[in-house]
Design a protein with these regions (language model features):
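A detector of single, family-specific signature residues
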Residues: 1-406
Length: 406
């Protein structure tokens, strides 16, 4: 058995192979790419003829080099860069480092402390596609918020009443209206019927368009502050550019959402996930993508809670004890469970009871929601492990049994 450390980068990778005694038996660099990966595999086979004879340590989970070695059947283990930094001090206190030395540190850390590191596993086809799509959606939503904020700032400067005409700046009717009439002077002269036709063109129904047109016309007739002429002349071009960006983002979001629906439909955990309170068609794909279809890759529910960030971190020394918020986790799973908990306390009896109990004891809103999220994680782990959908009646009856026997 040999242990291999890979200090990876975008352009090249440093390898170090150590034997079971910690002796460095081979070190080399390869360029990033298929040819380089195959060279590395060929050199490793001289010391580990079978992939089962080698353990590999690396500081990334998402990379082509990870995909390559997982596909060949190697056992890959992820080390957090913070962990590697601590292991580096075990060998050198001077702080000196190099790519080759870091590769050796990774290999030796895996040799001595393998039990501390999580083994990486290739995601199933459904989860991998969903992960790419849901993360793409997340990025588009962030871009949408950024563009909306820029639009808000621009309109406040020269056309503030536009912010009061619609419920938000990410609506088709807003884009259609402001592209056609980007200044107050142009919009003020519009009749109710003209505004109505613009809103209809944007896709609003006859009744809604008529009601909105009257409201918009009324607000446009109110006295407004007059900005400098140069400001009014310059800003419309910037606003139109932002509006076109917003339209592009909305179109991309629609396309990505359709692909998410198509790929999520066949995911093996879809029905199980959506049986839980608070988890529906929006949060389900995120959890399916980030957790994968095989829940057994988490050793137990405690490991899953740490992964999701719902379990706190305890610092204890002598008389000192402090419970802290867990920051090292999968933020997407944490956010999904936070939103699911918010939904669950409005629709699920036990979730509401738990939330109200903790709030009455003086616990904060966030602390109470995390307690609900912890319960959801326990249920999620159980139903995915047993392949049985969640049943609220069964859950409540089991709680009654446990409270009676305890």
């Amino acid at each position: 058995m040999v242990c291999i450390g890979i200090d990876w980068s975008d352009q090249s990778h440093s390898f170090c192979i150590v034997d079971k005694t910690g002796k460095k038996v081979h070190a080399f660099d390869i360029p990033h790419g298929q040819a380089g990966f195959e060279i590395a595999h060929e050199r490793i086979t001289k010391y580990a003829p079978a992939t089962q004879d080698a353990l590999v340590a690396i500081e990334t989970k998402d990379s082509l080099i990870v995909d390559f070695f997982l596909e060949l059947g190697y056992s890959l283990h992820f080390l957090n860069p913070k962990q590697t930094d601590r292991f580096r001090d075990r060998h050198r206190m001077s702080g000196a480092k190099s790519d080759g030395f870091d590769a050796y540190v990774l290999a030796d850390a895996l040799r001595t402390d393998r039990h501390l590191f999580n083994a990486l596993s290739a995601l199933d086809e459904y989860s991998l596609k969903l992960r790419v799509l849901t993360r793409t959606r997340e990025g588009l939503v962030q871009r949408k918020v950024a563009v909306s904020n820029e639009l808000t700032a621009a309109l406040k400067r020269y056309f503030p009443v536009a912010l009061k005409l619609f419920g938000g700046l990410d609506k088709p009717e807003v884009i259609c209206f402001l592209l056609a009439y980007p200044t107050y002077a142009q919009a003020k002269t519009l009749s109710v019927s003209r505004i109505h036709s613009v809103l209809k063109k944007a896709g609003l129904s006859e009744r809604v368009a008529q009601r909105r047109a009257q409201t918009i016309n009324s607000k446009l007739q109110e006295p407004q502050p007059t900005p400098a002429p140069s400001i009014v002349e310059a800003y419309p071009m910037a606003v139109k550019s932002l509006l076109r960006q917003m339209q592009s983002i909305l179109d991309e979001l629609d396309a990505v959402q359709q692909q998410i629906k198509v790929n999520y439909k066949d995911h093996p955990n879809k029905e199980l996930l959506e049986s839980l309170p608070g988890i529906a068609s929006t949060l389900g794909p995120v959890l399916a993508a980030e957790l994968g279809s095989d829940i057994t890759r988490f050793a137990d529910v405690k490991t899953l809670k740490a992964f999701a960030g719902s379990s706190p971190v305890t610092e204890r020394s002598g008389k000192y004890c402090e419970i802290k918020f867990r920051r090292a986790c999968n933020g997407r799973v944490r956010q999904a469970l936070h939103l699911a908990s918010r939904s669950a306390i409005t629709s699920c009896r036990w979730a509401r009871q738990l939330y109200d109990k903790l709030r009455s004891e003086g616990k904060s809103y966030g602390r109470a929601l995390r307690a609900v999220a912890n319960q959801l994680i326990e249920m999620l782990y159980a139903i995915l492990l047993r392949r049985t959908p969640y049943s609220e009646n069964y859950h409540l009856s089991m709680r009654e049994v446990h409270s009676t026997t305890s």
